[in-house]
Amino acid sequence: MRMRSDPHETTVPGERPAASYLDGQLLVAMPGMTDERFARSVIYLCAHSAEGAMGIIVNKPAADLNMPDLLVQLDIIRQDDAIRLPIRVGHMPVLMGGPVESSRGFVLHSPDFHIDQSTLLIDDGICLTATVEILRAIAAGTGPRDAVLALGYAGWQAGQLESEIQANGWLHCPADPDLIFNTALDAKYDRALRAIGIEPAMLSTSAGHA
């Protein structure tokens, strides 16, 4: 897995990285985030270990791309068939999941859909599948009940995420499938903050981490 490296990431002197791993949780960017790619981001962490971390940004749309257009580009449907897609598929946003492998699709979805040797169950309510088969199923109306598609992912090298958290770059909280799948993109950031117990208007760059 290729990981990103950002200049603002440094370990705070005298502090140790967080001991626990956060896969299956949400990362919520602090206002002081200096990397514009991650400003006001809500990221679902798919994997986190001593080797690094990988997550999907779940609240930023991909520029000038929707699900019907993507399905046509991938030759999953013909242009003429786009109007016949299930309504919820036609309105499904395509997200900017992160700067790593930004041409590759990743689908976070409910656990009612599974592809052997391709679907990763991250927690009880959220799975990850990154094959074209799930897009074919979604287009046919036989895919998961809930799903979001993202292009690319955010990655961290060993110890990098822990350092960012210690430096007050991120808050974190348990993931809520309803926030990920059923909340408007522009409402996810504030909802995630409130889930932590923080009123967005009161948050400052000097706030501590959860």
Swiss-Prot record:
Belongs to the UPF0301 (AlgH) family. It comes from Methylobacterium nodulans (strain LMG 21967 / CNCM I-2342 / ORS 2060). It holds the Pfam family DUF179. GO terms for cellular component: cytosol. This is UPF0301 protein Mnod_6933.
